Amino acid sequence: MELLSLAILSSFFAVANQCAATSPVTSPTTTTTEASVTTTIATSTSTTTVTTTTTVVTAACATCTTAQIGIITGNDGDMTPTSAITTDASGCSVITYTCERTPNVETDIVLITFYSDSQTPTDVGTENGVGTANVVMNCVNGEWVKDGIVINDVECQIIT
């Protein structure tokens, strides 16, 4: 009798294993890799590939150049200023024009006048100093701006 019970039990396990091997999968399995996600449900498989594209966009506030500012000369005391473009904490360009005689004479009265083609009159401001004068402009939407006004030209004058 024990042998018969063992044979029936063995037969039951064989049938159960065959059913388990052919039954559909009821819960999906997901495998994730670096570049793709594969999801297997029952007997169908769908694969989604994820592509990461890095595009470097130069902000309009970082596109200004020194060529956008004209230097006015021809008046008494006019000299060519020096300029330096730097980058602020936001990644935007900043330009500083410096006007001084070389070698520097600490008693010179120095003026930097800045001009805008969009204003009347076009001279929209002056920075002055003794020995040295500076004007700082920010690049905004691809244009140099001082106090909210687009600047097109600068003039450096030294009065002795």
Curated annotation (Swiss-Prot):
Residues 1-18 form the signal peptide. It comes from Caenorhabditis elegans. Pfam families: C6. Keywords: Signal. The keyword Signal applies. This is Uncharacterized protein R07B1.5. InterPro entries: C6_domain (IPR002601).
